[in-house]
From Swiss-Prot:
EC number in record: 3.1.11.6
Keyword Cytoplasm set for record: yes
Keyword Hydrolase carried by entry: yes
Protein name: Exodeoxyribonuclease 7 small subunit
Function as written in the Swiss-Prot or TrEMBL entry: Bidirectionally degrades single-stranded DNA into large acid-insoluble oligonucleotides, which are then degraded further into small acid-soluble oligonucleotides.
Reactions catalysed: Exonucleolytic cleavage in either 5'- to 3'- or 3'- to 5'-direction to yield nucleoside 5'-phosphates
Enzyme class: hydrolase
GO biological process assignments: DNA catabolic process
Coiled coil (residue ranges): none
Provenance organism: Pseudomonas putida (strain W619)
Alphabetical list of NCBIfam families matching this protein: PRK00977.1-4, xseB
Subunit structure, as described in the record: Heterooligomer composed of large and small subunits.
Family (UniProt): Belongs to the XseB family.
Amino acid sequence: MARKKASIDFEQSLADLQALVERLENGELSLEDSLAAFEQGIALTRDCQGALAQAEQKVQILLERDGELAAQPFDAEPEA
């Protein structure tokens, strides 16, 4: 259950960050609101980066073989 919650937290943080960027790009926020949104965006970015770093560590652990790390590049497109 903790894994699913972490995934949901990452996905929600990313969605919140995207919404903040859209609001900032609209240019309709006051200076004060823009600064608050920017500050919140920085916090969300740090949360997302932390979650990604944790996921990368877990992948490296899973790829570990015979006490050595077998680093393999991630291929986003499956071979046909």
